[in-house]
Amino acid sequence: MPIDYSKWDKIEISDDSDVEVHPNVDKQSFIRWKQRDIHEKRMQRNIEIKSILIQLTMYAKLNERVDYLLEKLTSTELLDSEKVMSKLNSEFDPQEKFDYDKLIKDKGSTLRKGLKDLKFDREEIENTPCYNEMIEDLFVQIKDDHPETKTDGDKLIEYLKEHRNRIDDVLSKQTIKLDDLLYQKAQLIVSDDLHTGFDRSFLNKDKPEEKEENQDKPKAPEAKKTTVTTTETINSPKPVEENTDKEILDELEILPATKEFAKIPSDNLSKAAEFLIKHPSICTEQQKDALIMTAFDLQLENKSDEAKHIVHQSLLLQYVGQLSDNGKAAPANVINAIKLFFSKIAAESSPAKHAFLEDVNQTFNHIKGRCEIIKEEQKQNAANKEGTGEEEEEEALIQLKALDDNTELSVNIPQEGTKEYEIFTTKLPIEFQNAIKTESIDEVNKEFAKLKIEDAERILEIFNECGVIGISGYIEDEKEFEELKKEYAHETANQEEDQSASVEDTVD
């Protein structure tokens, strides 16, 4: 049976977690690279959330002012810029602009959880314009773009309403995007989320002294006063339990329902959907991996058609599992995800169907290619054994390779004059310096292939010190599926909101 490395494909680590990595990858290097990637994504997500929050707040204030002017002033009065600004300044604070602290104070507990822990620099707040000034600029812009509005008040009102409708459209789209960003943020736990659940102290009282009839007996010693403090920490880390080889194999065992699902023809999507609705528990990453292992075995036996069919069925489980949090969601939510996904791929000409089949082909071709390599290696090993008459122990090598298909390793030369560049030129052997200067990970791996494990690990430590290896990500065309995930997330959120509306007055 071929070795399955898929358990390392989707590793996600936090700042302080211990992880298990591929034997050929340096553990500390992987953790540093992955942490850097997580921090960058977290920072970028917070920047987007802050930008959208400012935009939504600003547009809501602008609409409020435009509505007020349209209600209080006639078409003729709107042509007089001085009168417009005088009316505006009398009703609204001329200096009012975006103020995060004031927003938190005004909204209170009604402000959503993901918006309460943002940090704004002083420059970010100061650089935002006043709302009244923005209205004044809007009038100037409309009159410059449409000269007839300088004398025709009705035309001016028409363009003001048109601009307001565009703002409403932007508000709608940005609200959806903010919901998605906050949903992503809520799925991750960072150190800021950890807090004391409760902290309680109590004092043991002295036991009442019993009156002793016999005065000659010595009195019992008085009870000592003690203070006990109990602290509970929310989201305390769970001890890491290492799985044995048998447990790992048990995790990849195919359930009977999954075996039945694998027999359903690929072109009968309606039957597949009906089966999954009756057995939502198999829509997990674990069962998908078990089917992929079966596909490997079939391809090694040159049963390509059967292997591709198994890949098709396994990806159905994967897509539904990703939409429903890999089996962690309630059965009703998993069923909703099944119905939603199959409705998107039902039509032959739909982009979702095309993207799904493309993923099936790519996955099958990858398995096919790996099996060819495995067969070739088996032939070479057999030939070597026949030639030498004995089994030779293979020497372990360290090779740098990205474990995730959506990331790649990059080779970076440190900037001259920095501490990293000094380490690069003084500690690294000249062979590795030349390989890094080519900026090719293959050239670096060629040098690693010449070293023993101990020497290669020492080189990896120097790599960490001078930062010559980095991780960069790329995104394939999965727009349709990402939109599908967003749609499902919003439907689930709406259902949960409806269920909790009867018992909660406010929603974080």
UniProtKB/Swiss-Prot annotation:
This is Hsp90 co-chaperone Cdc37. SUPFAM superfamilies: Hsp90 co-chaperone CDC37 (SSF101391). It is found in: Cytoplasm. Transmembrane segments: none annotated. Co-chaperone that binds to numerous kinases and promotes their interaction with the Hsp90 complex, resulting in stabilization and promotion of their activity. GO terms for molecular function: heat shock protein binding; protein kinase binding; protein-folding chaperone binding; unfolded protein binding. Residues 201-245, 488-508 are annotated as: Disordered. Its main location: cytoplasm. Residues 494-508 have a biased composition (Acidic residues). GO terms for biological process: cell division; cellular hyperosmotic response; fungal-type cell wall organization or biogenesis; p38MAPK cascade; positive regulation of MAPK cascade; protein folding; protein stabilization; regulation of cell cycle. Keywords: Cell cycle, Cell division, Chaperone, Cytoplasm. Forms a complex with Hsp90. Interacts with a number of kinases such as crk1. InterPro entries: Cdc37, Cdc37_C, Cdc37_Hsp90-bd, Cdc37_Hsp90-bd_sf, Cdc37_N_dom. It comes from the Eukaryota. Belongs to the CDC37 family.
